[in-house]
């Protein structure tokens, strides 16, 4: 009896143990153990980290190379500018003539002095011939030109420049900056009693009808107004706008009458047709609602009434003013 009971217990335990063994034998990929999959995953993760580090390292080296190239380019430009500055200095300050030895004769002194003058004149001429070409190649416009010494060549005519420093105006005069749309400026000297029309005639002769002057966001339309009445003081900025030749500056009475040069509009205004079209659509929908009411549910009827009321208020608000 005991042996049979033990045998029955063993028979009842065997199916559970067999199921546990079957579950333990299940793998992610058939034919490949789970340990192999874990090792392969770890290797792939390490490779991904190494590749990410290498890519970051390469990007840093590339940026360093680019920074080095920019720095080297900046150094070369500084060297070129230094060379030009040296040439300009050589032109402005010619080399002094060597003093002859006191033991030499008077004839040798005269010859050496003549040769020294010729060499200095040749060097100054060579410097004057090289400088314009270098300025043309390097486009150096803001480089200050050094004046020659007292014994140099004949005086040159002064160049007129808008950006140069102007002399202080006489007492009673003010300086007004006329600024255009292309960010260029022109200095205008006027009296506070001068009018806007006089300012236009002085600095824009023949273009008074095309020029528009704007000060502090206000268009200066009245040519009889003085600068003092417009609170235009010294060093104020007036924006200038040049209109096309066909158009003129609108006067105070231009807004009362339509312009004669404005061409008539031949196109159809679509916005004005929206209200009639919507009225026709509402009329058609209401016609179908009255004659075929079986096709309209209660929510549809309520929505139609609401749209009609809203549209009526909108139309009365637009045309009832």
UniProtKB/Swiss-Prot annotation:
Membrane topology designation: Multi-pass membrane protein
UniProt domain Ubiquitin-like: residue ranges: 174-247
Intracellular or extracellular location(s): Membrane
KW Ribonucleoprotein (keyword) present: no
Keywords per UniProt: Membrane, Transmembrane, Transmembrane helix
Single Gene Ontology BP annotation: ERAD pathway
Family matches, as Pfam families: ubiquitin
InterPro entries membership: TMUB1/2, Ubiquitin-like_dom, Ubiquitin-like_domsf
PANTHER family the record matches: PROTEIN C7ORF21 (PTHR14557), TRANSMEMBRANE AND UBIQUITIN-LIKE DOMAIN-CONTAINING PROTEIN 2 (PTHR14557:SF4)
Protein name, per record: Transmembrane and ubiquitin-like domain-containing protein 2
